[in-house]
Each structure stands twice: as structure tokens, then as C-alpha cells.
Amino acid sequence: MVTMKDLLECGVHFGHQTRRWNPKMKKFIFGVRKNIYIIDLQKTLRYFRYTYNVVRDRAAEGQTMIFVGTKKQASETIKKAAISCGMPYVNHRWLGGMLTNFGTIKKSIRKLEIIKKMREEGQLDLLTKKEALMLTRKEEKLELYLGGIKEMNKLPDMMFVLDAVKEKIAIQEARRLGITVVAPLDTNCDPDVVDLPIPGNDDAIRSIHLFCNEMAAAMNEGKAALADETGVEVEPISAEEKEELIAEAVAEGEEFNFAEEGENA
């Protein structure tokens, strides 16, 4: 579990400049140094350990957590942390309705599944060059935005968010659905929108690594305590689904309006 030394070495105590802050974070601020807010690491350590234990215990009950972080310095770390504990993730762009309109999102995930299956079976080689090209482009875009949640068969129980300000839409959707929000809180964040806050820097690379890796470790520790595992039934792909998808990809051409479809459905 995280130590005070870890927090100091990763620069978790460095907040934003004093002109960029949320007054609600005052209780987590230790002081100011060269116009930079310094976060109280005693409180960070206490909140960090409490949150770790809660996440671990919920994972031991079979609960799941989606990892969300789309800013450049967090994207790859979010992906690696989520994969290391077998959890879903979004690390490029949060599409409106990803949770609140999950039914539509699942239809798009189904399309990705069909294209991949066709590729594995060599069926793309039997199509015209145009059809194969359009399906390949569609697959790439679906994979970019939905690759991290393609095995998410139900809504998650928890959401770990890296940068609560940037990912406010994801947090709003989670709160609307009663999904527990876990997030580090920098000095510009609103603690009222997070269920399990951990005051700390959410911009520095080493700090980001620490938060992500600890949450993944908590999930893995909890999952290890599970006695039983359940299998997932694979839905067969029909010929009609394949034909419809080929026609759809060709009709779309280079345009991919799945985001609007998810938001407006």
C-alpha cells in the first residue's frame, strides 16, 4: 500500500497556481510555496488508504471499475492499469452517452466484434477492395473509441477518473446512474462530485502512475479473494448481421457518425 515516501517522491503534494483553485479544496491545502498550492499529504495518505481498502473490498464482492483518463499524459497509463486488472477503460475520448445510453454503445461494440470475427475467418478477403477498406476503417475507429470497453457486458459499479475537471461529463453520467466515482483531486477540482476523493496532483506523470497503479493493485487484490468465476456466453454472428454491416460501412465511406448516434439516440 502507498506510503508517505511514495507521495513525496511522486510530487503528489504539488497543486495548481493560486489563481487556479476551487475554494472547496481549502480543507486539503497545507500552504503555498512560490504561488503554488501545497496539498496536505497527511490527509492524502489517509484518504488514499481508505479509498484503496474500499475499492479492494468491493472488488472482492465482484464489483467492477472503469478507468477513465483521456488527457495526453494519462492516456497510456490508464490503459495499462486497466488491462493489468482486467477492467474496462476509456483513454481517448469520452463519448456522450457511453454510460447513460449504453444500449446504443453495445450495438456499436457488436459491430466491432463482427468485423474482427470476419477478419479472423478470412472473410474480408472475399469482399471487394472497397468493402474491405471501408470495414477496416470502421474497425479502426470503433477500436480507438470503444476498444477499452468492448468486453464490458454491463455498467460498471465504480469509475476511477484521472482529472475530474476534464472528465466532468463522464462523472455526470456516473452520478446519474449511481456509479461510485473515485478520483484524485487537484486544487482546482470540486470535491462534491466525487464519492471517494484522494487529494493530490493529477497532472504530473509520476503522480498519475501512482494513482493508476494503486487502484489497479486494489482491484487485483480484491479479485484474488473471489472464490468463484463466471463465464461469458458468446453470442453467435448471423450472416444477416455481416451483410448489414458491410452495406453500412460502404454507405458511410470515410464518415463515422457513431458519436452523434450515441448522443442523439
From Swiss-Prot:
GO MF entries: structural constituent of ribosome
Entries under InterPro entries matching the protein: Ribosomal_uS2, Ribosomal_uS2_bac/mit/plastid, Ribosomal_uS2_CS, Ribosomal_uS2_flav_dom_sf
GO cellular component: cytosolic small ribosomal subunit
GO biological process assignments: translation
Keyword flag Ribonucleoprotein: yes
Record-linked SUPFAM superfamilies: Ribosomal protein S2
Alphabetized UniProt keyword annotations: Ribonucleoprotein, Ribosomal protein
Origin superkingdom: Bacteria
Pfam families: Ribosomal_S2 (PF00318)
Signal sequence, renumbered to the chain: none
Family in the record: Belongs to the universal ribosomal protein uS2 family.
Protein name in the entry: Small ribosomal subunit protein uS2
Protein's organism: Aliarcobacter butzleri (strain RM4018) (Arcobacter butzleri)
